Amino acid sequence: MARKKASLDFEQSLADLQALVERLENGELSLEESLAAFEQGIALTRDCQGALAQAEQKVQILLERDGELAAQPFDAEPDV
């Protein structure tokens, strides 16, 4: 259940961040509102980066647990 909650938290943070970016790009916010939105966006970005870093570590741990596989850095870019 904790894994599902963490996933939902990441998805919600990402959705909130996208909504903030749209509001900032519209240019309809006052300076103070823009600064507050920017500050919130920075916090959301850090949360998302932290969640992604944890996911990467879990992938490495899972690879290390299997005796036949060595830990390999997670590469989000597919080999083409």
Curated annotation (Swiss-Prot):
Enzyme class, broadest EC rank: hydrolase
Sequence similarity: Belongs to the XseB family.
Record-given protein name: Exodeoxyribonuclease 7 small subunit
Oligomeric form and interacting partners: Heterooligomer composed of large and small subunits.
Secretion signal span: none
Gene: xseB
Molecular functions per Gene Ontology: exodeoxyribonuclease VII activity
HAMAP family assigned: Exonuc_7_S
Species annotation: Pseudomonas putida (strain GB-1)
InterPro entries (UniProt xref): Exonuc_VII_S, Exonuc_VII_ssu_sf
Keywords carried by this UniProt record: Cytoplasm, Exonuclease, Hydrolase, Nuclease
Subcellular location: Cytoplasm
